[in-house]
Each structure stands twice: as structure tokens, then as C-alpha cells.
Amino acid sequence: MIRKDLTIRYACGSYWIISTDVHLYADASYHAPVMTNETGYHIWICLKKHFSIEETAETISGLYHISYDNALQDTKEFILLLKQNGCMEGLWKYSSLAAVIP
């Protein structure tokens, strides 16, 4: 699940994932903002609404008129980006990603 202190904002032509917790900026748990594009923004919104990976891929497929498989791959890559940047916490809800995301 996405950390509760994170939000996404649009600035300078990109979307930025940032922390809203001012205390994080003073300690070792600080993570730099993560830049993403419009597709990442829509995947973010789906994940914040607790969509499954499959539901997210279906949404992205319909939104951008791409194949489900391409949307699924994009979704997996975005979730991996989130995990690598410390944006995920708690138990991993998306069991279908267990083999993809270490």
C-alpha cells in the first residue's frame, strides 16, 4: 500500500510524489520527491483507491487505448518504482506481483 504521508502534485510539466509529513525532512527516513508522468499519475490514483493491479491495468488500458498486457506491464513497472523509492508500506496487497517485485 502507498504510504499515507505521500501525495502527488503537478509542477513544471511533471507529476511529483512528495511527503506531506514535515518531520520526515529532519531525519534519516527522508526520501527525495519522485518524478512521474501522466500515466504514473493515473496509476497512482487507482492505487490510492485500493484498485487491484488488474483493475488498475484495465483502467489504464481503457484510458490510453493500449492493450491490457502493456497496461499491466506499465502498472508493474510503476509499482516497482514506488517500492524502490520507499513509497510503499505495510503488507503487500497485490499478491499477483510477488514474483515481479522482490
Model region roles, listed by residue range:
Residues Y30-P102:
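Long, charge-rich, low-complexity alpha-helical segments
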Residues M1-S14:
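Hydrophobic packing positions characteristic
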Residues G13-Y41:
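Short alpha-helical segments that sit at the start of domains
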